[in-house]
């Protein structure tokens, strides 16, 4: 039997990889072999960073809460401990949003935390 080189199937497969590599610099968006390696590495970065995003947002929320808490003369850790003692179940995402958009509500929560800490 004669050898079959792949023809349209190979071309389609390579075109797909080159299309995924659009926007890459240098040979990485032109040459199939290099483009394939870079696309695979890009998938690895994407997989890793989808998980990293969660911790990055948590760090951002904590930084925002801490900044707003210190304006109200309390540290982040004491605020969180006070809220726990006061049985206030507000997550960090909501606290950070309150700290930015509704300072009065955030101050009320800080006062609750301070009362709970004083009663301890």
UniProtKB/Swiss-Prot annotation:
SUPFAM superfamilies hit by this protein: Ribosomal protein L20 (SSF74731)
GO cellular component: ribonucleoprotein complex; ribosome
This protein's UniProt keywords: Ribonucleoprotein, Ribosomal protein, RNA-binding, rRNA-binding
Entry-linked CDD domains: Ribosomal_L20
GO BP of this protein: ribosomal large subunit assembly; translation
Region forming the signal peptide: none
HAMAP family: Ribosomal_bL20
Sequence similarity: Belongs to the bacterial ribosomal protein bL20 family.
Protein known as: Large ribosomal subunit protein bL20
Species whose genome carries this gene: Ligilactobacillus salivarius (strain UCC118) (Lactobacillus salivarius)
């Amino acid at each position: 039997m004669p050898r079959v080189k792949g023809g349209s199937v190979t071309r389609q497969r390579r075109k797909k990889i080159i299309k995924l590599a659009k926007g890459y610099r240098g040979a990485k968006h032109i040459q199939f072999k290099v483009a394939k390696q870079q696309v695979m590495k890009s998938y690895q970065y994407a997989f890793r960073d989808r998980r990293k995003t969660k911790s990055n947002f948590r760090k951002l929320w904590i930084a925002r809460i801490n900044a707003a808490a210190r304006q109200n003369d309390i540290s982040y850790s004491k605020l969180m401990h006070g809220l726990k003692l006061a049985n206030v179940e507000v997550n960090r995402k909501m606290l950070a949003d309150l700290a930015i958009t509704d300072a009065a509500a955030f101050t009320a929560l800080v006062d609750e935390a301070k009362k709970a800490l004083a009663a301890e």
